[in-house]
């Protein structure tokens, strides 16, 4: 166990796992339709600046001996110091070492595989050399944007994103065109698998294979089957990197079946996955009291942006409508929306055009909107993992944040108890007033 400035990092090199990947029974398969065209980095990159990571460390990005184009992009985007996760992962990752990393939300995991892949890429027109898989369309879209931002000065590198929502023929057209074919493919398992299966995406030249939020994909049999088939279509010798905020011992073992002697980095023990700088409270109330209390909180709390989580599409739609009736700048995202509309709404929220987002758990994992500093669980999450991913929307990159969970039933109370036991935290009752200095970054 190596103690870092404010985190515990467990780092180890594991032995090669000789086990074959197991086969799984057929499961219901959802093939997601496709996505926008590949972007070259002559296109305008997202100019949104996140600022420096939390903590001041002696190690700077220059110490990683990255390409000048990458260092220029890092500086241009306002990053100054690597996070603890990046300090431990990047030096090995850029050498092609397999990486298995568990780190809490907001610690810069995405930049690890983006920088490692871009550092090593040798683009050849018509060849896909990097595949990144993730479990939602929104996350795929966001990761594609991160590649675009960091490769803004690598004008010969093209990134494409493939997910459901548009006809697959659009993706097939891009991949068939040597001048448009992306060198980096970000996608959801269903759509990527369909393109590989139909021999439209040639994975035989892939050198880097990445799973983000890997537990979500490997726990679901249909997604796991798709991931395995894509994996088998790639060369035996390649770099494999997997990342998530939560990794059970079983899933860790599954991950390592895809890898050869991976560097394993576990930031904070699983039982201590708390978010630094995040104030967490709960509030007991009746179901019928939720709307009035939410109204009071939105009136009285100071916030940049707030995420409100509910348990169903219907409740998301109804609560969003109610908030708009009360003149709150609200918008909602849920699985019932057409893909183009979901992406449009996500962009509006990220661009600060709306300050309140009502969402189902589809928005809970991996989605990064840096201005969010308050999360309200209007409906309790289903389990401790879901809670972690929801409240992780606030307090990104070690900044301050506030999470409030409504508890209105015995079942809610049980979930709260499991959360406290799992993460060894005591979540107190919401006081009459909360000092804004404790959750607003000055």
Curated annotation (Swiss-Prot):
Keyword terms: ATP-binding, Helicase, Hydrolase, mRNA processing, mRNA splicing, mRNA transport, Nucleotide-binding, Nucleus, RNA-binding, Spliceosome, Transport
GO molecular function: ATP binding; ATP hydrolysis activity; RNA binding; RNA helicase activity
EC number: 3.6.4.13
Pfam assignment, any one: Helicase_C
GO annotation terms (biological process): mRNA processing; mRNA transport; RNA splicing
Residues annotated as domain Helicase ATP-binding: 90-265
Name of the featured protein: ATP-dependent RNA helicase SUB2
Recorded name of the encoding gene: SUB2
């Amino acid at each position: 166990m190596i103690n870092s400035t404010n985190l515990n990092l467990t780092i180890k090199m594991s032995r090669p796992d000789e086990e074959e990947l197991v086969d799984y029974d057929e499961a219901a398969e959802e093939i997601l339709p496709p996505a926008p065209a590949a972007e070259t980095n002559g296109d305008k990159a997202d100019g949104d600046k996140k600022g420096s990571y939390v903590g001041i460390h002696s190690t700077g990005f220059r110490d990683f001996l990255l390409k000048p184009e990458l260092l220029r992009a890092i500086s241009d985007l306002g990053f100054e110091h690597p996070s603890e996760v990046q300090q431990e992962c990047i030096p090995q990752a850029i050498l092609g070492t397999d990486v298995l990393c568990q780190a809490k939300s907001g610690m810069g995991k995405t930049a690890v595989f983006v920088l490692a892949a871009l550092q090593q890429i040798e683009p050849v027109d018509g060849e896909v050399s990097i595949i990144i898989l993730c479990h939602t369309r929104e996350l795929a879209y966001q990761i594609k944007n991160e590649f675009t931002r960091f490769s803004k000065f690598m004008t010969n590198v093209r990134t494409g994103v493939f997910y459901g929502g548009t006809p697959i023929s659009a993706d097939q057209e891009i991949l068939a065109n040597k001048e448009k074919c992306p060198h980096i493919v970000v996608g959801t398992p269903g759509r990527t698998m369909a393109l590989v299966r139909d021999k439209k995406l040639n994975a035989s030249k892939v050198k880097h294979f990445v799973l983000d939020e890997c537990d979500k994909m490997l726990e679901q049999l249909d997604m796991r089957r798709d991931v395995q088939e894509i994996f088998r279509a790639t060369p035996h010798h390649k770099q494999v990197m997997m990342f998530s905020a939560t990794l059970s011992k079983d899933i860790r073992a599954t991950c390592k079946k895809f890898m050869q002697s991976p560097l394993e980095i576990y930031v904070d023990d699983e039982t201590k996955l708390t978010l630094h700088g995040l104030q967490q409270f709960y509030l007991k109330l009746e179901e019928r009291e939720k709307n009035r209390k939410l109204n009071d909180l939105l009136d009285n709390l100071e916030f940049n942006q707030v995420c409100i989580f509910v348990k169903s599409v219907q409740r998301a739609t109804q609560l969003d409508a109610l908030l708009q009736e009360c003149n709150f700048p609200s918008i909602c995202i849920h699985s019932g929306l057409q893909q183009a509309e979901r992406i449009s709404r996500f962009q509006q929220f990220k661009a600060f055009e709306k300050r309140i987002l009502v969402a189902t758990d589809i928005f809970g994992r991996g989605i990064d909107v840096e201005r969010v500093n308050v999360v309200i669980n209007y409906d309790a999450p289903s389990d401790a993992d879901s809670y972690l991913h929801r409240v992780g929307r606030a307090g990104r990159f070690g900044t301050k944040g506030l999470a409030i969970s409504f508890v209105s039933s015995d079942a809610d109370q049980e979930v709260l108890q499991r959360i406290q036991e799992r993460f060894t935290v005591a979540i107190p009752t919401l006081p009459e007033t909360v000092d804004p200095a404790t959750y607003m970054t000055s």
